[in-house]
A protein has these predicted regions:
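A helix-centric hydrophobic-segment signal that preferentially recognizes long
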Residues: 2-188
């Protein structure tokens, strides 16, 4: 009888300690995830602010001030408000960037410095997103994250002031690692 009581107390103690450890691991994981998410969000806000500066500069310096330019700037602003549709935002930025490069709008060193800053912020944003996504995918972090409604973030692929590939076409391409892979076993 004493052995059974000892065994029951031992199991209850193990369960209580296990629940306490689980609680602290979950709390720590969610705090770290929240920090990384806030870092991604703050970089997105910094990126958005710099794009607003770019838009003001483009519209003030542009001699043509064409309807197309205003249209592309407005589409870009609308896309930034809804970060969920990142591919659409990138497509609008691609179109605006292409329009500016094709029209050869020479806006001087200010534009070059803004483009350089935008590219630096994009690089920072992508590294922050990578850090967040890697932390998100580690076991058991993704379980806690899904329970709290966190989702993976998407990377930006646009480079400002340079010729880019259409992001929609780029998203349809087969990745380099999958080009020579036999996938016939998947269709069986």
């Amino acid at each position: 009888m004493k052995i059974i009581k000892f065994f029951i107390k031992f199991i209850v103690t193990i369960l209580v300690v296990g629940l306490i450890v689980f609680y602290f691991v979950q709390k720590n994981t969610l705090n770290n995830l929240e920090k990384r998410k806030n870092n991604v969000t703050s970089l997105w806000e910094k990126f958005d602010k710099k794009l607003n500066d770019r838009d003001k500069l483009i519209l003030s310096v542009s001699t043509t001030n064409s309807d197309s330019l205003k249209y592309f700037v407005d589409k870009s602003k609308l896309g930034r408000q809804n970060k969920v549709k990142l591919l659409e935002f990138e497509f609008n930025e691609y179109k605006l960037n292409k329009f500016l490069l094709n029209k050869c709008l020479d806006m001087g060193k200010e534009t070059e410095s803004i483009y350089q800053e935008l590219n630096e912020i994009t690089t920072e944003y992508n590294s922050s997103v990578k850090d967040y996504n890697v932390y998100y995918t580690i076991f058991p972090n993704f379980i806690f994250a899904k329970r709290k409604g966190y989702k993976r973030e998407k990377f930006l692929t646009i480079e400002y002031g340079k010729e880019n590939q259409d992001p929609i076409e780029k998203s349809k391409e087969i990745p380099e690692w999958a080009k020579n892979v036999d996938t016939t076993f998947l269709s069986k």
